[in-house]
Regions:
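Structural motif
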Residues: 27-29, 67-73, 116-119
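Beta-propeller fold detector
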Residues: 39-44, 82-88, 129-136
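Short loop/turn segments that connect beta-strands within beta-propeller blades
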Residues: 33-35, 76-79, 123-125
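Repeated scaffold domains used in trafficking and secretory/extracellular systems
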Residues: 6-12, 44-54, 91-103, 136-158
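A short helix->beta-strand "capping" segment at the edge of beta-propeller domains
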Residues: 1-4
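Short linear proline/tyrosine/threonine-rich motifs used for host-factor recruitment
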Residues: 20-21, 30, 83, 112, ...
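Short beta-strand elements that form the blades of beta-propeller/WD-repeat-like
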Residues: 10, 17-23, 57-64, 108-113, ...
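Feature marking well-ordered beta-strand scaffolds used for ligand recognition
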Residues: 40, 60-64, 99-100, 132
Length: 158
């Protein structure tokens, strides 16, 4: 059998350069570049395709594409990175879909704006706290993370 060396891939860095997310197979490490140490490490069932930090560097979202697609939430609290869970999809619809228009962060809420639906997730727990069908859904207030997410998908969401 042929074995390949494990490829380390940097998925993202925080805006201040302190944090770096490194994928090592299905394992993800959050590296503190100032202390040159691993702050948090987690093994997932699937490979992570990308990562998005908010501008404060306190919220991290990992994105898996493909068969086991999902969005996974980490939060920096009490001096360490903590895994808070997977953002809960609704029946028959994942979190990232081709109808997704905007991703915002405001008042401890991650807001996903679709063509005709708005979903809000609690940044502390990753739980879905608001899910409503809204005609011509429109929301603009908050830190816009949309372009950072689109960078993972290259040509738009799916």
């Amino acid at each position: 059998a042929i074995s390949f060396p494990l490829m380390n891939l940097v998925l993202a860095s925080s805006e201040d350069g302190r944090w770096q997310v490194v994928r090592e197979g299905r394992k993800v490490n959050i590296i503190d570049r100032t202390a040159n140490s691993c702050s948090c490490s987690r093994i997932f069932l699937t490979y992570m395709s990308g990562a998005v930090f908010d501008c404060s560097g306190m919220v991290l979202l990992l994105v898996a594409r493909g068969l086991r697609a999902g969005v996974f939430l980490f939060r920096f609290a009490n001096g360490e990175w903590q895994y808070r869970g997977e953002l809960e999809p609704i029946p028959h619809q994942g979190v990232i879909t081709k109808r997704l228009q905007k991703i915002l962060l405001r008042d401890n809420r991650l807001i996903f704006v679709y063509n005709s639906r708005i979903r809000k997730y609690d940044v502390e727990t990753g739980k879905l706290v608001y899910n409503k069908a809204v005609r011509h859904a429109f929301e603009t207030e908050g830190e816009d993370l949309t372009q950072k997410f689109k960078g993972i998908y290259r040509t738009g969401f799916y």
